[in-house]
UniProtKB/Swiss-Prot annotation:
The gene is Cdk5rap3. Residues 268-503 are annotated as: Required for interaction with UFL1 and mediates interaction with CHEK1. This is CDK5 regulatory subunit-associated protein 3. A motif (Shuffled ATG8-binding motif 1) lies at residues 266-269. Widely expressed with higher expression in secretory tissues. It comes from the Eukaryota. It comes from Mus musculus (Mouse). InterPro entries: CDK5RAP3. One of its GO terms (biological process) is mitotic G2/M transition checkpoint.
Amino acid sequence: MQDHQHVPIDIQTSKLLDWLVDRRHCNLKWQSLVLTIREKINTAIQDMPESQEIAQLLSGSYIHYFHCLRIVDLLKGTEASTKNIFGRYSSQRMKDWQEIVSLYEKDNTYLVELCSLLVRNVSYEIPSLKKQIAKCQQLQQEYSRKEEEGQAGAAEMREQFYHSCKQYGITGDNVRRELLALVKDLPSQLAEIGAGAQSLGEAIDLYQACVEFVCDSPTEQVLPMLRYVQKKGNSTVYEWRTGTEPSVVERPQLEEPPEQVQEDEIDWGDFGVEAVSDSGIVAETPGIDWGISLESEAKDAGADKIDWGDDAAAASEITVLETGTEAPEGVARGSDALTLLEYPETRNQFIDELMELEIFLSQRAVEMSEEADILSVSQFQLAPAILQGQTKEKMLSLVSTLQQLIGRLTSLRMQHLFMILASPRYVDRVTEFLQQKLKQSQLLALKKELMVEKQQEALQEQAALEPKLDLLLEKTRELQKLIEADISKRYSGRPVNLMGTSL
């Protein structure tokens, strides 16, 4: 018998209410009686004496049977003057709370209510709070990751912007104006290139002599455009065409298209609808399209190139429309007023002749190398002195000079300047291309700031939920101890264990 009293009673918490009903500790209609008790409690708490402990019991917690017992004990002190010779109280306050205690004890209603509270806390309230806290922590990690992505993406796009600006030779402070300013400086740059052609006289004569020697008969002069620029410099098309210098040059006016939206006025649009989670956290809607793929930007080797739809060679095929009517004699107007290196047709001829001369000199350097066969050397024994008096080093030096001139004329920066010169509205396309990178950088920076704010909101929400969870766990543990102690009394002090609470 003594061993039987020490055998613990293990009760699964989820089956606790059924266990009480099956063992007739309470009846099936306990819920209706609990509703009546709750109504009486709500009425009784409207008239309570001034007491700090009573106020603490009534604030922010569910009032159950053991709270009522404590309130009755406190009222015995405050309502002592209303006690008669028979030990009863005439105070309505005391009568109300004594009635509530009596109703609780009827059919052990207090016990089943406590068990109901315990089951609800263990099965619903505590898991719900834990889920909300876990959601806050998940959001913080997600926002932290997006913050890092936004920061890295903003830096990458900004670097691409300045790298592209460097290719164009501008600072990027005002892309449009700087590009137009470069076009205004283009004539002086082309004049320098034309002046650089003056050092090619020896190479041109060498090529002319070789052609005459190989053909074994007098021929017309080779490289006419290159010869002309070498002697006259970068003159006007009119002078090249007519052979006389114009008395008046009416250059086409560079049309400046109207200013577009200010560069610092960026329309961020709408960040989309935000969804509110169960915990009150405002989470970013998954459907938001930021229009930016960080992975593709990092892998795209041609990110700094503009796709203009046609072949890149089309840049050199743009023709400038002639303005006005036929010009009188001595007046250079329209395309005639442009310089040879500004006008696409003559510029292309100049570049072609530079490349032709470069190929010739490169081939002569190869023929003069040590690996050259004896036959090619013997062929030039009867050549003019200008051909025989050359060295490989001299050929390579001339080739280097030609390559520098070709490189300056065909560089990506120069191609874009020629396109701007031919079509000023091309400036807007380049400006939009460059500004798009800067706008994307600023958008990613703003997104990063937004992620920081959302991360802070999630952290604050977690900080507000954790004390609630701690308080609920404490109250639930108290309920568990009270229930285990009450059931233990009904079974001669046998230990009672409520299983599955995981507190």
